[in-house]
Amino acid sequence: YNVNYLPIVSSGRAFRALWKSAYSKVSELLAAVVYEDPWLAGGHNGLSNAEDPLKPEDPYPRVKALRETMREGGIPDTTPIIMAGGVWYLRDWNDWIDNPELGTIAFQYGTRPLLTQESPIPQQWKERLMTIEEGDVLLHRFSPTGFYSSAVRNPFLRSLEARSERQIAFSTKEAGDHIFQLDVGVKGKNFWVTKGDLLRAREWFGAGFTVDNL
């Protein structure tokens, strides 16, 4: 339909794969490429299995690598890369603007517009966003999609965190360190766990947690 497209990627490697498989066939319709920082952007993020969710990487080398990949495909530097994730003040990005290594750069705000008078979200939520401190945002994998997602820690998310911490590995037969039979909450079933996990499971069960909410 001759509609311009703006792919969202989190690495030069991801763009290369998409470019070779599809985008190169309609290169004239490529309006821009959005680089979504997999550690700083909100919502679902494109963190790969090779990347550590607890060790954020500097976005500059990653965006530079993305531009180099675009150049390999013959895409001119006038095609913008849109930096998304962690953008609040443009003054924080002065060394990115008019930088020949990066080519044309634009910036995408996500959180700031939510705080405007025109924003339809509840005032209570706006006030909450204004009081967020370090550690209040969690990069988690609780989404049913299986992808990492970044969200503000609310009571529901905290309950999922606590539940996730009460997970133990088990075996359906004795193997390795899994030689202690789980004896709480699994009536009629045989599971073997490590001694440490058995003690933890007993403690959780004694605190009122069941197999369904351990």
Identify the meaning behind each predicted range.
Residues Y1-L54, A65:
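Conserved alpha/beta-domain cores
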Residues I8, E36, A84, Y109-G110:
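Generic beta-sheet signal
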Residues P7-F15, D77-D92:
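Glycine-rich beta-to-alpha transition loops that act as phosphate-gripper elements at the mouths
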Residues L30, P38-P59, T69-T78, L90-L214:
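Conserved active-site-proximal phosphate/metal-binding subdomains
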